[in-house]
Amino acid sequence: LLSSIEGQRPEVRVRPPFPVHGGLFRKPTVVNNVETVANLLFICSEGGEAYAAIGTPKSTGTKLVSLDSAFFTPGIFEADMGTPLDLVFKQLGSGFKRAVKAVHIGGPLGGLVPVSKIPDLTLDFESFAQNGFMMGHASVVSVPEEYPMIEYLEHLFSFTAHESCGKCFPCRLGSTRGKELLQKAQNDHNFKIDLKLMDHLLDTMKRGSLC
């Protein structure tokens, strides 16, 4: 975003320096999303300590959760950080209206959570990290029981390959290679993906890409 405003190639930046120290034109810059701005009224009226008292010690405040049409009550809901994820789905979303095998949380680069793991998670960054997931912006996309997971994974790799800014070669090349492997596995029934190769590819992308 900052590079685009400056007229440069829209590429991710190495941090530090963080925007608050050296952002737009290398000057201190505050970059906040609408969720952060929405919390300002409560913080200004009740005080920062009151807001920090909500949630968990490391994930304070509330979180906006977007539930898709697989729920009986879809929509955007605000919940305290630390709320059991199962409670969010059952009380706010009124549960699933069809069989679901996984939920994709936090956008394209977020985590695919099997339904069996939902009771283990709470709505905070630590819980997700400890279980190998990312909460991100907490959007929830449900994967129906009958939908082929390999097709969904191909969609994610295709998105990443298309949206990669190209700065980091593990992301630029790895996303395309992952997409090719998944496409071949679907088109050639005699081909099986080498899981060690796929794990190595994912680990390389994770370690070697800034995003």
Label the predicted regions.
Residues 49-62, 96-106, 167-170, 190-198:
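Flexible, glycine/charged-enriched surface loops at secondary-structure junctions
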Residues 12-15, 121-210:
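Ferredoxin-type iron-sulfur electron-transfer modules in oxidoreductases and energy-metabolism complexes
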Residues 1-81, 93-95:
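Hydrophobic alpha-helical positions that pack around
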Residues 1, 105, 109-114, 203-210:
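Short, surface-exposed loop/turn segments at secondary-structure boundaries that line and modulate
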Residues 95-131:
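Terminal amphipathic helices with adjacent charged low-complexity linkers/tails
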Residues 80-87, 148:
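Short, structural beta-strand-to-alpha-helix junction motif
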Residues 1-6, 11-16, 42, 90, ...:
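Short acidic, glycine/serine/threonine-rich loops at helix termini
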Residues 68-70, 79-80, 91, 103-108, ...:
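Generic beta-strand/beta-sheet core signal
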